[in-house]
Amino acid sequence: DCGYDPVTKELYARDNVGAAPPEQVNDAGWIRWRANDLNRFLKRLSQRLKAIDWRVLITNAPVQFPFSYVNFAQEYPAWVREGSVDFISPQIYWSTSAQYERELGLQMSRLEDVTRL
């Protein structure tokens, strides 16, 4: 249910001919709009930080994809692909090493460049 604050609702209306955000939090268009907005923000932030000091490393520890996308609009494969982050460290928590290795493999399959994981 992230994104229903007044500022985000105003930004959504601006981008959508005055329309209010969908009431259904799982609306595909709403999730896509929020993810695009977050992707643009992270790209701008990354560029500004790198302009100040190119040596700074931009990292993030999102929850697993696609859960991160559906629930928090965190599309971390796009962040890696677009160069908005230098590397990511997905939050993967399992009680057995087999479960962990399986989930890590799934997360790696989401990335074109696994060296940034």
Report each predicted region and the residues it spans:
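Catalytic beta/alpha-barrel core
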Residues: 91-97
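Surface-exposed substrate-engagement region within the catalytic domains
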Residues: 82, 97-117
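Polysaccharide-binding and catalytic clefts of secreted carbohydrate-active enzymes
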Residues: 1-82, 94
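Structural preference for beta-strand elements that scaffold enzyme active sites
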Residues: 55-59, 86-89, 116-117
